[in-house]
């Protein structure tokens, strides 16, 4: 079946179910509210004083600018995941819910762990943001690494084996890259997959519980 026809059929079936339709639009609204609130929270984080951690790994070498390499992997992953997930509305819904919960975990973690950026970091400037906007460059959104966690979450969400392997490799490459660039402390990156996995399992638990109660 052609991609466009498959897409149309799957979404028509999904949206014809009132429960699925309501859950999807509520998820979009809640996620939008979470992301807007989180963007304001990041300004608060950027303005407060934190602590500089001693990181034995970062102390071993000088930072390397891997900005373009990192964002190439990130955007390639996001586009590939979107192409796959949009074909399966239920899976896309799961992805949005997991991501929203993970962002909430990031906000809580950052609030409880006020950190200063590593002293010799090279800022990770998003090429897309810098090209089309004038967004502030954030340096204190540290614990935990959102880039690493997001890619690991995509690894969990994608069902095709070959793509899962690629996403896992990309996760490892991005994790290493942000450490090499001194954008994050090692601990920020090390714990990121655990938060992604926890978000994924929590949402799955409530979905399975909801199905049993139907």
Q: Which residues fall in each region the model found?
A:
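Active-site His/Glu-centered metal-binding helix of metallohydrolases
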Residues: 73, 149, 186, 190
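Membrane-interface loops
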Residues: 45-54, 86-164, 171, 211-214
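Alpha-helical transmembrane segments of multipass membrane proteins
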Residues: 30-38, 42, 105-110, 195-200
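Interfacial helix-loop-helix junctions of multi-pass membrane proteins
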Residues: 141-143, 173-199
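Membrane-proximal cytoplasmic C-terminal regulatory module of class A 7TM GPCRs
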Residues: 202-214
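Aromatic-anchored segments of alpha-helical transmembrane domains
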Residues: 35-37, 103-109, 171-182
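Membrane-interfacial alpha-helical segments at the cytosolic side of multi-pass membrane proteins
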Residues: 78-83, 148-167, 193-203
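N-terminal transmembrane-helix/juxtamembrane module of multi-pass inner/ER membrane proteins
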Residues: 2-77, 115, 122
